[in-house]
Design a protein with these regions (language model features):
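Pre-Walker A adenine-sensing motif
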Residues: 2-16
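Hydrophobic anchor at the beta1->P-loop junction of P-loop NTPases
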Residues: 23
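Conserved lysine of the Walker
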Residues: 31
Length: 404
């Protein structure tokens, strides 16, 4: 079991506090493993496992706990038999109706430490904000980074070079369970295909009561085909009209929002760097795991430039950056990143194979006058840094401890 120290270092300061620890992210990205890692640390610090109460609400054994009252009664009864602080671990708690009322009551009435996971961003809106506002901390969990993937892959293929590891990562992606399948191609694709269907059905269709599943599937296919490309709801509506599907742009935006709430997609807004304002349209979208894209739709090798962008974008999120697409005049910067006032600029391209490409990628920074780090990231093996702009091979960039 990989330690996932990037996340544990953020969660650790809150272990044992009264704040509710909430872990969100796409289905099967490793949230349940985070609960096990927390239990492991608690045990190592002297907490007895008899103080743990763990419930996975996708397990039929707990199908009787589908309401807040039933769950409250169950936990109260079990807590009465435990000496000392009770540690509560609730996996996929969204399956319980009005669960936030139960959690708030347990927080108030018991000496407890609460950890919950969910696969939908709606968890932290609406009713939850009403009941738990200011009393929880959220941690978004992502599929494996390249570094995490390589650690596991080399436990299966110890002689794999860093280039071979990256080539495998490019196609397989970072879903943790693939290691159990030893990253074999056919089983891995089957697993990712079924996972995609599960996200689509359980976390999007069922949760949002979508009736027009065909429309949803067409929208998802369009967004996945256009990962990392700016488009508007109006342009997508025109595309669908050509396929004999007339749909309002507002409906399209709602469906895409549902996908983002299920962590299937991430929306990246555009920022006018000269006017210092967020632009209102033509956002970009990236997929939570590029391995899902390859398994379901294929084309990662043909769309290599966009997939490299997708990989870098997710790594920026993992490391805590807020990310926008930068526009300055007629030029675009792939990623403008901010973390507590510290900025970072990143351009991603496949290869710097021509003078035209070199001028385009490095020239995107011509009007940026600040002294924050600026990178061009590609698959090139040789350092082509110039004029204070750093060039890095994508593998080295992803594995670097910090960027400065």
């Amino acid at each position: 079991m990989i330690k996932r120290e990037l996340y544990m270092s953020r969660i650790r300061p809150f272990i044992g506090t009264e704040l509710i620890k909430v872990m969100t992210g796409i289905r099967r990205c490793g949230k349940s493993v985070m609960l096990e890692l927390i239990k492991q640390e608690l045990t190592e610090s002297g907490v007895s496992p008899t103080q743990f109460v763990s419930i996975n609400f996708e397990d039929m054994s707990y199908s009787h706990l589908q309401t807040a009252q039933a769950l409250h009664d169950e936990i109260t009864a079990r807590a009465a038999e435990i000496e000392g602080k009770v540690y509560l671990f609730f996996d996929e708690i969204q399956e319980v109706k009005d669960w936030e009322k139960c959690i708030n009551s347990l927080r108030v009435s018991l000496d407890c430490d609460i950890y919950i996971t969910d696969s939908n961003a709606k968890l932290l809106s609406g009713e939850l904000a009403t009941y738990l506002g200011g009393r929880y901390v959220e941690f978004v969990i992502y599929p494996f980074s390249f570094g995490e993937f390589m650690e596991l892959y080399r436990s299966i293929a110890p002689d794999a070079s860093i280039q071979q590891c990256f080539q495998k990562y490019l196609l397989a992606g970072g879903m943790p369970y693939l290691a159990n399948l030893r990253y074999a191609d056919a089983p891995s694709k089957q697993y990712l295909h079924d996972l995609f269907n599960s996200v689509q059905l359980k976390d999007i269709v069922k949760r949002n009561k979508i009736r027009d599943v065909d429309l949803l599937e067409r929208i998802i296919a369009y967004v996945i085909a256009n990962v990392g490309t700016t488009f508007s709801a109006t342009s997508l509506a025109k595309f669908l009209k050509n396929e004999q599907r007339t749909v309002a742009p507002e409906t399209i935006l709602n469906y895409i929002r549902y996908c983002c709430e299920a962590y299937l997609f991430y929306q990246v807004k555009r920022e006018d760097l000269q006017g210092k304002q967020i632009l209102a349209s033509n956002e970009k979208y990236y997929i939570a795991d590029h391995g899902i894209r390859e398994a379901v739709f294929g084309g990662n090798t043909q769309d290599i430039n966009l997939i490299l962008e997708n990989i870098v974008y997710l790594e920026l999120l993992r490391r805590g950056y807020e990310v926008t697409v930068g526009r300055t005049g007629d030029k675009e910067i792939d990623f403008v990143c901010d973390k507590r006032g510290e900025k970072l600029y990143v351009q991603v391209t496949y290869l710097l194979a021509s003078e035209e490409t070199v001028n385009r990628e490095f020239g995107a920074y011509d009007s940026i006058r600040d002294n924050f780090p600026k990178y061009v990231v590609s698959l090139d093996e040789f350092d082509m840094s110039r004029n204070g702009i750093k060039h890095r091979n994508i593998r080295d960039f992803l594995l670097a401890e910090e960027w400065n």
